[in-house]
Amino acid sequence: MPRETFDRELRALQDEVLVLGSMVEQALTESVDSLKRRDRTAARRLIAGDRLVNEKRFAIEAAALMLIATQQPMAGDLRTLAAVLEIAGELERMGDYAKGIARINLLIGDEPLLKPLLDLPLMAERARNMLRRALEAFVRRDVALARAIPTEDDVVDALYNQVYRELLTLIMADPRRIEQANYLLWVAHNLERTADRVSNICERVIFTVTGELTEIAPDHGGLGGIA
C-alpha cells in the first residue's frame, strides 16, 4: 500500500473514532436528560441504540487490525493504531454507562424523584466536556491538553461525593427511600466512571505522541457500573 493511501486510511480511521465519540456523547446527554424528564420511551430508544455504538467500535477495531496486519506500521503509526484500539474500547464502555443510566430510568418507573437529580446533570456536563476535549487532544496530538484534562476529574469526584452525602441524608430521614437513592447513586457512579475513562484516553494520547506509558487515571477500586 502506498504511503499516501495508508495515511488516508489512517485519517479515516481517526475520523471514525470521532464519530464514535459523538455517538457516546449524545448517549450520555440523552440518558441523563431522559431521566430528568422521566421519559422512558427515550430511555428504551437509547438502550436499543447502544447496538450501534458496539457495531461502530467493532468496525473501528477490524479496520485498525487490518492495517496493522497488512502494513506492519512502525513507531508513531503503530502507536496511533494502538491508541485507536484502546480509545474505541473506552468509548464503547462509556456507551454502556449511558445505557445503564437509561435502565435505571426504567427501574425507577413512575416513582417521583427524591430530588431534582441533585448534581447529576452537572456531573454529566463535566464528563461530556472532558470527553470532547480528550478527543480534541487526540486529533491535535496535544500532550499538554491530555495531561491537563484528568485534573478536572477532581471536580467530578467532588460532585459524586456531594451526591452520596445528600442521598445518605435522604435515606436517614426516610429509610423507605433507600431503593431509589441506590439507583441514583449508581447513576452518579456511572458518570464518575465515565470521567475516569476519559483519563484513560488521555493516557493513550500521551503514549501516541511521546511513546511514554504513564498512568494518570485515578483508581477507584474497580467497581462496575450498571450497564
Residue ranges and their predicted role:
Residues M1-A227:
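Cytosolic, long alpha-helical scaffolding segments
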